[in-house]
Amino acid sequence: MLTALLPGLAATAIGAVLGIWTSRTLATLNYRLDDEQDLPKPGRRWWIIWTSALSLGSIAAWLAATSSWALAPVLLPLALTGPALAAIDLDVMRLPNRILAPVAAVTILGLASTGVTGGGWATAVSGLIGGLVAGAALMMLNLLTRGGVGIGDIKLAAIIGSAAGAV
């Protein structure tokens, strides 16, 4: 029990610090495009600190409790960027490719490394299948709602599906 608690607590503290940094970075509104500059400012987003801390801490505690450290490169990129993506999406209803693309790349590399380092190729393949299924499901919603679900949402669903499929 203690072996899972200590990494979880340490990661929670690191996540809180990263959450403070993310919140301050997003407060500059540098992610906004030219046509989004006139939108109202979103105000203070203290929830970013808590979600960063809890997501990183809970994933680290789970990885330690299950000894599934091979999945860390698959799960951590989304945990680290998820709060920022949520804040940006809530503000401008857009998920920037400059965040999604590296997260997708690291997640795919994480799936490949999981297959090589002991997580097994079945884990990597199920992660890829999860990403394809989630991406395809949201692509269907995009087509059915005529763009009500955006392309960024489809990309994010594929990343989440890959991470969830690997677990």
Locate the predicted segments by residue.
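A membrane-topology feature that recognizes alpha-helical transmembrane segments
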Residues: 1-167
